[in-house]
Amino acid sequence: MSLSVEAKAKIVAEFGRDANDSGSTEVQVALLTAQINHLQGHFAEHKKDHHSRRGLLRMVSQRRKLLDYLKRKDVARYSSLIERLGLRR
């Protein structure tokens, strides 16, 4: 299940540079993090849903790539984003 339009708009407003900034790296990582967190709750109930688990692993990989890109380009923005999202790195 994907995020609602309202949830996406809230994330874009919080992490974007303006209300229509859906393409910046920070927004993309925040949207992927929200989807990943939503799917983790799904897997607590549906342990054998391997088809969706593959999608989850793909999202985690995409988020990792975006975070690596951001770390290469701007370490300060990377550190700020990690702290705001509460990721382990």
Swiss-Prot record:
Q: Know the name of this protein? A: Small ribosomal subunit protein uS15
Q: Report the GO molecular function annotations.
A: rRNA binding; structural constituent of ribosome
Functional description taken from the UniProt entry: One of the primary rRNA binding proteins, it binds directly to 16S rRNA where it helps nucleate assembly of the platform of the 30S subunit by binding and bridging several RNA helices of the 16S rRNA.
Q: Which InterPro entries match?
A: Ribosomal_uS15, Ribosomal_uS15_bac-type, uS15_NS1_RNA-bd_sf
Native organism is: Edwardsiella ictaluri (strain 93-146)
| Description of how the protein assembles with itself and partners | Part of the 30S ribosomal subunit. Forms a bridge to the 50S subunit in the 70S ribosome, contacting the 23S rRNA.
- Listed PANTHER family: RIBOSOMAL PROTEIN S15, BACTERIAL AND ORGANELLAR, SMALL RIBOSOMAL SUBUNIT PROTEIN US15M
- Family (UniProt): Belongs to the universal ribosomal protein uS15 family.
Record's Gene Ontology CC terms? cytosolic small ribosomal subunit
**Among the record's GO biological process terms, what is one?**
translation
Q: Which SMART domains match?
A: Ribosomal_S15 (SM01387)
Keywords linked to the UniProt accession = Ribonucleoprotein, Ribosomal protein, RNA-binding, rRNA-binding
> What gene is it encoded by?
rpsO
